[in-house]
């Protein structure tokens, strides 16, 4: 599911969102994509109830606003829904905490995305490959 955030309400931003949804549909025809306005909570919740994945690609819940979330209706969470987050600070967002409390079994935080962005940035800045396995051991150590 892809949801449109009103932070950047330009035609270019909207076009980009729709193009990404179309590209995803072409790459994975069996994957249904839905673009909806985050301000329409009824549509958002109905869409989540029909989805296999909920991925927050906004900054809602990121420090210093850790107590914010896009989801205020806990009934949309279910055990088999996969909940993912691109935010890595805080490590566990309110959305992730709420999903866990509601019984969601598969919850993924944003540290993996941060790691792989770092891999690409390292290569861009140094021209060398980052020692990913070494960094993973340090980065994901509890």
Residue ranges of model-derived segments:
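Glycine-rich phosphate/diphosphate-binding loop of Rossmann-like nucleotide-binding domains
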Residues: 1-49, 53
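Alpha-helix N-cap/helix-start motif
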Residues: 10-13, 17, 64, 92, ...
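Generic detector of bulky aromatic hydrophobic side chains
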Residues: 24-27, 59, 126
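Surface-exposed, flexible loop/turn segments at secondary-structure boundaries
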Residues: 7-8, 62, 115
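Adenosine-phosphate binding glycine-rich loop
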Residues: 82, 86-142
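Short, surface-exposed, charge-dense and proline/glycine-enriched linear segments
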Residues: 8, 65-74, 137-142
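Rossmann-like adenosine-cofactor binding region
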Residues: 30-107
């Amino acid at each position: 599911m892809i949801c449109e955030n009103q932070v950047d309400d330009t035609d270019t931003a909207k076009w980009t969102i729709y193009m990404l949804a179309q590209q995803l549909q072409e790459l994975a025809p069996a994957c249904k994509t839905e673009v909806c306005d985050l301000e329409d909570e009824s549509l958002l919740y109905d869409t989540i109830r029909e989805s296999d994945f909920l991925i927050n690609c906004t900054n809602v819940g990121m420090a210093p606003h850790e107590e914010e979330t896009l989801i205020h209706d806990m009934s949309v969470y279910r055990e088999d829904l996969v909940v993912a987050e691109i935010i890595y600070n805080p490590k566990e967002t309110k959305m992730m905490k709420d999903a866990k409390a509601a019984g969601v079994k598969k919850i993924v935080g944003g540290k993996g995305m941060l790691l792989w962005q770092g891999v690409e940035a390292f290569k861009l800045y140094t021209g060398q490959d980052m020692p990913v396995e070494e960094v993973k051991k340090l980065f994901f150590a509890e």
